[in-house]
Amino acid sequence: MIAHKHITKIIAVVMAVAVCLCFCAVAFSRQIKAAAGDTGISMEYETALFDTDSVISVNILMDDADWNAMLENSTAEEYYQCDVEIHGTTFYRVGIRPKGNTSLTSIASDPTTDRYSFKLEFDHYVDGQSCFGLDKLILNNNYADATNMKEALIYDMYQYLGADASLYNYAKISVNGEYWGVYLALEAVEDSFMLRNYGAQSGKLYKPDSMNIGDGKDFGDFNADDMDFGNMTPPDTQGNANQANSSAPSQTPDTVDRPQNRDSSGETSAEPSTDSGERPSMDFNFAGGRGGFSMSGGGADLNYTDDELDSYETIWDGEVTSTKKSDHKRVVTALKNISEGNDLETYMDIDNLLRYMAVHVFSVNEDSLSGMMAHNYYLYESGGKLNLIPWDYNLALGGMGGSSGATSVVNDAIDNAFSGTNFFDTLMEDETYHSQYYTYLQQLVSEYIDGGGFDAFYERVRSQIDELVKTDPTAFYSYDEYLTAADTL
């Protein structure tokens, strides 16, 4: 009888402890997951740099000779040493270099401008140095965008849907105290980004780029000399998009309403104005014509071909984190199972990919997997599961070309937008995932565009950058051209 009483007490104590443990697990689940590396970690730079309520101030302190040498040798993309002041805090011995792809080449060949985009790598010369926890800050020059808002808008939409994407803010750039220009500041997709989004036990990161052709393998007879870079210089400001064949009918479902263009009076119209005051789409001319060439070799298009690791060299060449063959095998295994439609939840971060697809398709960005060039995205793998992280949207909203005018851009197909890859096909063949994708598209239309999200973004940005653009000494456009483009957006 006495033993029975003790057992009853013991059971009661155990149950009480169990209840407390359950409560703690729920109350502190985020902290527990963060410690285990299963979820993101809050970073100081989220507010110190990317609080979009105010523009950040970036003063690059650099020897004039080094600055000029860096600009003159921009295509080498070599790091130089500088100090950087941000909001009154000085970071010493920071690495800086020009960045870009076609934009860098165009600016390098244009004697009238040195307005390059830049990378600031805080730990390049000083191990462990960061900017409020950020390892690398990207400063984009808003090339080929008279509105100065396209890329910021797309990143704002990614944040609105809660997709994994870089934080953004506008930055007033000075060089040795002299105003250089207003840029878009972005969180680089590297270690800090992974820590913020995925926690301490991050996976493997790649940036495949079919433009990095190396010795030409996987690209047949293609030669970079066949590309007409002469037409990649910033075009005129009449908004006349370059024409190309686009005969595929729109696959827009009846349940998703396309946003309509608003004129200056606030009225909506079915057709967007072409008098946008912005540079039209970039005209990329390739030998043999658009229809006969696709830059998608070495696995950059994420299509499964076979089990040979060498078939995916473009992915491995784009490694951001250190990787080995066992990591590569997990990627190929995932691509194979995705192509066969096997256990997609094991091999794809489905919800984030659907959010990525919705914003990316909404952006009509042909300089990407949805165009003819398999680049401008990051591939993230963790535990055999694949995810995509967006990148480079200055040519969004039809700026790349390849459409038959503004009407085609507005009515761009949404079911088969990623024509250059089969990676998303199995998702679209599943009714549940397809429906969720439509839901995210509709959310962008009804909540972000029509529900005030875009208006809030637009009013905030205009109030922040109008005067900075007006006095920008390196701007690609006149202030009047900016006003025309911004008013049309």
What are these regions (language model features)?
Residues 1-489:
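Phosphate/dinucleotide-binding and metal-coordinating scaffold of catalytic cores
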